[in-house]
Amino acid sequence: MASLDSLVSFFLSTLFVTIVSSQTQCRNLESIISFGDSITDTGNLVGLSDRNHLPVTAFLPYGETFFHHPTGRSCNGRIIIDFIAEFLGLPHVPPFYGSKNGNFEKGVNFAVAGATALETSILEKRGIYYPHSNISLGIQLKTFKESLPNLCGSPTDCRDMIGNAFIIMGEIGGNDFNFAFFVNKTSEVKELVPLVITKISSAIVELVDMGGRTFLVPGNFPLGCSATYLTLYQTSNKEEYDPLTGCLTWLNDFSEYYNEKLQAELNRLSKLYPHVNIIYGDYFNALLRLYQEPSKFGFMDRPLPACCGLGGPYNFTLSKKCGSVGVKYCSDPSKYVNWDGVHMTEAAYKWIADGLLKGPYTIPSFHWLCLGSKIKSKESLDT
C-alpha cells in the first residue's frame, strides 16, 4: 500500500502540473483570424462607411458598457470574439478595414456587419435585395489573401501564421436568410441552405490549403427568439409560439435545420482533413438556454424584449431602432439577453462564449485545443 508521504507527493505534483497547464493553456494559438458579419464585426463596417453616413454602431449607446465609447461593435460592450481573445490571452481582434497602421500580429478581423455568405448578385437574382453591405465571405477571404504580404511577409511565414491561428469562420450566412425573410421569401429560404453551406465549406478548404489547422464554425442563433422576427411575424395564433420561451417555433425549426446541415458538412470535412481541428459552435442551444431559464443565469424573467429600442411587446420597432433619435436603452443591460432587437447584450455574449470555451456548446469540446496543436478530440460531430 502506498505510504502517506508518497500519496501527498503525488497529489502535490499533480496539482502543480494542473496549475501550470491552466496558466499556459492554448499557448499554441498565437493569433485570431476572423470572418463573418455583425456578430463578429469589431469595427469594419464603420471603417468602410462614409464619414457622413456612419452606421448606428458608430454612436452611443453602442459600446457604453465596457469600452465606454462606440467601437463599431453591434453591442453595448464586448462580443463573443472578444471573450475568446481574452481566454486565449490575446488582445481584442482589431478590424482590418479602415485601420491605419493597425497591429495585426496577434489577430485580424475581416467580419463586416451586414455581410452575407453568398455574393449579393446571387441573392439579387433570387429577388433578395437588402442593401446594407456587399462585403460577402468571398470578398473577405479575397481581401485576406491580398493582405498577406503585409501581414506575414514570406509564403513560409504566412503558412506558419495561418497554421498557428484560431480561425473563426462566422457566424456567417445568417444575413442570407435574414434578407430573404425580410422580403417575404419564406418559401425559398431553404433553397439557400446548401448554397450557404457550400460557400462556408469552400472557404474552410481554401484556408486549410493555406495552412489553417484550427477552426471555429458557429451555427445560427434561434431566429424565432429574436425581437426583430417576433415583431415582424407577430400573430394571434398561440400555436406558433413555444409555450416555454415565447419564441416562434417555425423559425427556430429552420435554424435547427440549417445547423444540422452545417454540422453534417463539418463532419465530412473533419474526416477529409483528420489533421485539422474543425469545431462547431452551437450558438443555437447556448442562447436558447437563456430564453428557457433566464433568471437562473441572472437575466430578467422576460428575456425577449430588447434593452435598446422603442414600442411594442418586444421594445422594438422597425422604423425606430436603437441609436435613432428618441430611442432609449435600459438602465441595466446586464439583465437583458437582447440588446437592440437583432444582437445580444455583452452579458449574453459572455454566457455564450463561456459555453463555447468551458461548457458543452462546441463539438468537439474546445479544451482539446489547449492540450497542444497535435492533440485532437476523437469525439465525432455525429454525436
UniProtKB/Swiss-Prot annotation:
Glycosylation sites: 134, 184, 315
Classification via SUPFAM superfamilies: SGNH hydrolase (SSF52266)
Signal peptide: 1-22
Keyword Manganese listed: no
Active site: 38 (nucleophile), 340, 343
UniProt subcellular location: Secreted
Any Pfam family matching the protein: Lipase_GDSL
Alphabetical list of InterPro entries matching this protein: GDSL (IPR001087), SGNH_hydro_sf (IPR036514), SGNH_plant_lipase-like (IPR035669)
Annotated keywords: Glycoprotein, Hydrolase, Lipid degradation, Lipid metabolism, Secreted, Signal
MF annotations from Gene Ontology: hydrolase activity, acting on ester bonds
Primary location group: secreted
Enzyme Commission code(s) on record: 3.1.1.-
GO BP annotation list: lipid catabolic process
GO CC term, one of those recorded: extracellular region
Enzyme class: hydrolase
Domain of life: Eukaryota
Gene3D superfamilies: SGNH hydrolase (3.40.50.1110)
Similarity comment: Belongs to the 'GDSL' lipolytic enzyme family.
Matching PANTHER family: OS05G0506800 PROTEIN (PTHR22835:SF683), ZINC FINGER FYVE DOMAIN CONTAINING PROTEIN (PTHR22835)
Name of the protein in its database record: GDSL esterase/lipase At1g28610
